[in-house]
Amino acid sequence: MSLNDNFVYMPPQGELSILYEDDDLVIIEKPAGLLSVPGRLPEHHDSAYYRVLEQFPNAKITHRLDMATSGILMFAKYRDAEVAVSKMFQARTVKKNYIALVQGKLPDTGRIEVPLITDWENRPRQIVHFELGKQALTLYEHLEYDEAKDVSRVLLTPITGRSHQL
């Protein structure tokens, strides 16, 4: 039995907020709980990508966020813009940051460096595997600590781009 056997996809309803638009790009706010791209099963087709296609039929997604992650998604309106953005991601000129809440109090700064591999029984989850995993590096900066809840707010900066590395 895998962790996904009882999963029921219930994406948030409502229109996506457009944060920015120009001749080449449209940037939206993806809510937590919505897939960035459609899943394999028909009941997993509702996604930010398909919702954006309703307004921008030629749109191409330039990157993805995990379903549980809320944040900014960028879409290229045309193939030329998609190629240009893809080159920026490959050259690592695009900087990605995430804010997360984690249990406990962390040092002011740090790095999380572990080798990750797909947990095939529980896809899309990743597991740490020191022999077969691919190195994943995330830098963090401690922003705030809530002593009552024992929770830290941290700024995460992934250096590598492994799936589900955060």
Report the location of each language-model feature.
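RNA pseudouridine synthases
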Residues: 1-165
